[in-house]
Amino acid sequence: MHLIIPKDYDPKLSVKETQQAIRYIRETFQDEFGKQLNLSRLSAPMFVEKKTGLNDNLNGVEKPVSFTMQDMGDEQIEIVHSLAKWKRVALKRYGFDMHEGLYTNMNAIRKDEDLDNYHSAYVDQWDWEKVISKEERTVETLKAAVRQIFKVIKHMEHEVWYKFPQAVHHLPDEIHFLTTQELEDMYPDMTPRERENAICKKLGCVFLMQIGWKLDSGERHDGRAPDYDDWKLNGDILFWYEPLDQAIEISSMGIRVDAESMKKQLKDVDAEDRLSLPYHQMILNADVPYTIGGGIGQSRLCMLLLGKAHVGEVQAALWHKP
């Protein structure tokens, strides 16, 4: 666990005021977000059956919390890591049309998370997914969605300033786009995290694209599950965060895999055994729509807008006591 304690840190709001601000941000953001992207709110599962392949495998090494249920024999049930796969199936199941989408108030447990100022074993985010056409599986479609999300975040900055002027952390007015390879070329002697910090400190806000494949150096910028994002059409929204003097990731998102990209990515990480799972069969047989989607961290957004130094100030969870 790497903990940063900012010198002369002033949280601005009391605990009670912080809770009021959190409620305001969550309620206001999701309404505006849903309008901007044409999304309807859906209830979401806390757990899924392991055999469906619907859980998010993250980087492939994190193990989900699992259990059995009295009425289901030895069937393994898993607490979700995210709803990345479930959402795509839900769009088909609930009959969403072209350019319609959903968002959920997703709660997850990631017991193997490396804890720090931003990371908790408890994950709360708006998970969203939207139907697009095959022809819209492009970088421009991805960028357009990113700009819409950035617009909502900037809108929230002004809304929070109006309600809680003493707590606002000011955000940049523009988001910049670049790929992980471009970033490696700019800072070849830095680690991926150092590169993110360097570019965000320089530009303020960045959408860093194409995360998953190995770069020219032979290293990956970061790990990504091979069976939901297309690694050529994904990315992270990153802000420079002065209170901690480093970048903060607010959203990970992307255009989802089609059959071809999924097979290539599964082969790359030696996970082709997943192709037999129901979810993967639906993609191979084109039984689910083409989509774009992602997750927006609720607690991290509250941190960003309120200038908080630790995620524990905006959510209730557990951390090691130093």
UniProtKB/Swiss-Prot annotation:
EC number of the protein: 6.3.1.1
PROSITE patterns cross-referenced by the UniProt entry: AA_TRNA_LIGASE_II
Top-level EC class as recorded in UniProt: ligase
InterPro entries in the cross-refs: aa-tRNA-synth_II, aa-tRNA-synth_II/BPL/LPL, AsnA
Keyword entries, A-Z: Amino-acid biosynthesis, Asparagine biosynthesis, ATP-binding, Cytoplasm, Ligase, Nucleotide-binding
Pathway stated in the Swiss-Prot or TrEMBL entry: Amino-acid biosynthesis; L-asparagine biosynthesis; L-asparagine from L-aspartate (ammonia route): step 1/1
Location relative to the cell: Cytoplasm
Catalytic function, reaction form: L-aspartate + NH4(+) + ATP = L-asparagine + AMP + diphosphate + H(+)
Major site of localization recorded for this protein: cytoplasm
Matches recorded under SUPFAM superfamilies: Class II aaRS and biotin synthetases
GO molecular function: aspartate-ammonia ligase activity; ATP binding; catalytic activity, acting on a protein; transferase activity
GO biological processes: L-asparagine biosynthetic process
GO cellular component: cytosol
NCBIfam families xrefs: asnA (TIGR00669)
PANTHER family referenced in this protein's UniProt entry, alphabetically: ASPARTATE--AMMONIA LIGASE
Family membership: Belongs to the class-II aminoacyl-tRNA synthetase family. AsnA subfamily.
Protein's name in the database: Aspartate--ammonia ligase
Native source organism of the sequence: Lactiplantibacillus plantarum (strain ATCC BAA-793 / NCIMB 8826 / WCFS1)
